[in-house]
Amino acid sequence: MAYFKLVNFNGIAPQVSPRLLGEGLGQTANNTDLDRGVLTPITSNSTIATLNAQARAGLYRYDFGGQVYNLEFTNAVNVQPGPVADDAFDRLYWTGAGFPQMGSSTQLLASGSGAYPRSFFRLGIPAPTSAASTSITSGTDDGTQTQYSTSYVYTFVSAFGEEGPPSPASTVLTKVDGQTVTISGMDTATSKSNTNLANKRIYRSNTGSNTTNFQFVKEVSLATASTTDNLNNDALAEIIPSTYWIAPPDDDTSTYPNGQMLGLTAMANGIFAGFSGKRICFSEPFLPHAWPVAYRITLEEEIVSIAMAGQVLFIATKGTPYIAAGTDPQSMSVVRMEAAQACLNKESLVDMGDLAIYASPDGLVGASGNEITVLTAGLITPKQWQAQFYPSTIKGFLWQGKYIGQYYTGSAYGAFMFDPRGGKNAFTTISSLATGHAQGGFTDPDDNELYLIDYDSGGGNAQVELFQGSTTNTTQTFKTSQFVLPRP
């Protein structure tokens, strides 16, 4: 009498014939947790919050004052906490919700009703458009003092102390120490919406033996259109630091025809990265409002998404991927990788820690350092991948070291779990990632849990579900390989 002894249970490998599957591999492994090598069902999700609308695709859990607030967005967003340690304002920065945005706890959690964030500001400080007018209004030149040819610029400064690029320079005038200059005609507002401007800083040119620099004169309120300067030349303070600190690409289509910056990502040394069209952009270190043009690099292909992959920035495109590496935005190097693995969906790209994973036409691709690998090769053929997992629709999430993917067939949603650490239990399927389907989600680094936005097809508001947050088991299915026995 024939019998079978099944000791280990592992994942699936559709590429391999059911008769040739290795020990423990199955034809089906659905809703099952195989980390311990035994059949254990995954549990259902638990609902932990209700959002303020049905259509929600972005979520960020903001911990403030010992309480967690769900920040919700209509679109998929990239949210980053500020790079400054112990930030007194508890600022967040994000892209994907229109022009790049930011806010402190005061804006995010403002009193009132409705969804968080309650308010926000535009990321970046605009330059004043009007040059100041200047004239000498007191003091005389008796011909015995050194004359200086000088002009003035001024900058806008936010309530957070962020400084923007300068105005056009005023007409040059000639003065000597002891004379007072009246500076007038300065802008008291900007045409940009959602700004947080509070003050202006005024600088005066000072010509040395080799160069001419603008040096600090004074700071005045935003509402001040006219002021005076009677500083002697040797009393001028620091050189203007913000000459090239322009805002990131925004909704000004005349300047940025490829659209606003997307994909906000935190790199080492306080540098932020983002992209617009084919252009990858970097911020000044620890100054996320400052994005000099000199720190922007144009690639050959349109960028789809970006993520950290170990110590380098991985740049997924519609064709060949790239990596960017460096510790200073002035010296970033960008290298095109030798792998034609396009990213089919920006939401499939996930930072897994040591590597980034995304959906390509051939399977799940992993990028780490300067290496790129089709991780599902040997498990799923490219043809099976396209036919069964619809990679152009995949939304990816990180959960406890595993890649969780949801796809859409055109009529139904499905999901899978992939462990990039490999092994025979690397790939399993999930019947449904959320009660309805996941519109988006957020992996909270504080607890390593995955929070999903569940869509209510009945018209109700979206809900936040904790992945496998309940104690109720799902129905698991495991189908073994085919066993072929000799005729009796």
Task: Describe the residue ranges of each PLM region.
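Surface-exposed extracellular loop regions of Gram-negative outer-membrane beta-barrel proteins
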Residues: 313-338
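Short loop/turn segments that connect beta-strands within beta-propeller blades
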Residues: 286-288, 326-329, 369-371, 420-422
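Loop/turn segments within WD40 beta-propeller blades
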Residues: 307-310, 348-354
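Beta-sheet repeat architectures centered on beta-propellers
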Residues: 1-97, 149, 159, 174-180, ...
